Design a protein with these regions (language model features):
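Conserved N-terminal phosphate-binding loop of PLP-dependent enzymes in the Aspartate aminotransferase
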Residues: 1-391
Length: 391
């Protein structure tokens, strides 16, 4: 079906931060399957572990205990504030799970009041109907009305707008059951959450007995220079969702929760493929290799290098670049609307053998593999410099 505007290219192989097309042209990959290929392409350890797993068992369903799933669950909970995990196959599924969880929590605690879920303007939570309804971008929702009701939207990083919604719901016999929000808005324009905002958000959720669930589909698993995006904010959520980088290019999603939010019972929710042995082995390998190779430190260092390079580009091309923002290896250059657009720059980068991806607000988004090297960041910056010189 015609659901993608694709580049007219097919890649035949990849290694680390590089991809090769059928003609042998090499591309530096600063997209990483949209923040997904954490260990890069064709990682030796991941390849070996998954080859071994294929010779054992791939899928049996959640009718039975799954050793790899149990190992992954222990690993994730030992490394985070969460105590329990539900596994699925994607970010949209993980966020659908979170929405169902918030709704059930509300029905248990709201004492008959209408249940409301808060989400942020410019957010992105997925393409399935509930996740789409929670997404604060009308351009994605157009044509799919009526959306699921019960969502209200606040301005990201603006606590006054959150407080106003809590007060309005209180006066209208409604109850905010939970808040679903990204620690750093990816599709919305690579906008990091502020510590002050999230501290206030945590406090008001506690005051009103509302769940705070973070969408870490794009920010989790080391992407920001911390293992979890919430670690940059000085708070702990009641739960958070993962996907993308968790599987290193293999389909897996997860909803992790503290005990307070561990309210699903058998039959409440399920996934046929969720947490299958193959996907869990991929995720276990990604987490283990991130720890073994100290990849989080690389993300921090390369993020600092990238940010410094963006600062230099901003000074050199002030008419083109109006700002930079991001954390670790999820960063964006804000392009001046009057001069160029991010899609045009994406196309020019493609011609020069550099893969980047646009984000909202006319932003060129950079989300390379977490293993990208110092030399490769310099190549990336040189290619961007060349593009801006030609504009």
């Amino acid at each position: 079906m015609n659901t993608y505007s694709r580049f007219d290219i097919s890649f035949k192989k990849g290694k680390g931060s590089w991809l090769w097309d059928k003609r042998g042209k090499r591309y530096l990959d600063a997209v990483a399957g949209i923040a997904t290929c954490s260990l890069g392409h064709s990682d030796r350890v991941l390849r070996r572990r998954l080859s071994t797993q294929l010779g054992k068992i791939q899928h049996i369903s959640n009718l039975y205990n799954i050793e790899e799933q149990e190992q992954l669950s222990r690993t994730l909970t030992n490394m985070s504030c969460a105590k329990s995990v539900f596994f699925c196959n994607s970010g949209a599924e993980a966020n659908e799970s979170a929405i169902k969880l918030i709704k059930k929590y509300g029905n248990k605690t709201n004492k008959g009041k209408e249940s409301i879920i808060l989400a942020a303007e410019s957010s992105f939570h997925g393409r399935t109907l509930a996740a789409l309804s929670a997404t604060g971008q009308p351009k994605y929702q157009k044509g799919f009305e009526p959306l699921i009701q019960g969502f209200k939207f606040f301005k990201f990083n603006n606590f006054d707008s959150v407080k106003k919604l809590f007060e309005e719901c209180e006066n209208n016999d409604q109850k905010i059951s939970g808040v679903l929000v990204e620690p750093i808005q990816g599709e919305g324009g690579v906008i990091p959450g502020s510590k002050i905002f999230f501290k206030s958000l945590r406090e008001i959720c506690d005051r009103y007995n509302s769940l705070l669930i973070l969408d870490e589909v794009q920010s989790g698993v080391g992407r920001t220079g911390k293992m979890w995006g919430y670690e940059n904010l000085g708070i702990e959520p009641d739960g958070f969702t993962l996907a993308k980088g968790l599987g290193g290019g293999h389909a897996i999603g997860a909803l992790l929760v503290k005990e307070k939010a561990n309210i699903f019972s058998p039959g409440d929710h399920a996934s046929t493929f969720g947490g299958n042995p193959f996907a869990c082995k991929a995720a276990l390998t990604v987490i283990e290799e991130i720890n073994r190779r100290n990849i989080i430190n690389n993300v921090y260092l390369r993020g600092e290098q990238l940010s410094a390079g963006f600062e230099e580009l901003s000074k050199k091309f002030p008419n083109i670049i109006s700002g930079k923002r991001g954390l670790g290896l999820i960063q964006g250059l804000v392009i001046n609307d009057d001069y160029a657009d991010a899609k045009k720059i994406t196309l020019k980068a493609f011609d020069k053998g550099l893969l980047v991806v646009p984000a909202g607000g006319n932003v060129v988004r950079i989300v390379p593999p977490l293993v990208i090297s110092r030399r490769e960041i310099n190549i990336l910056l040189d290619k961007l410099n060349s593009i801006f010189e030609e504009l």
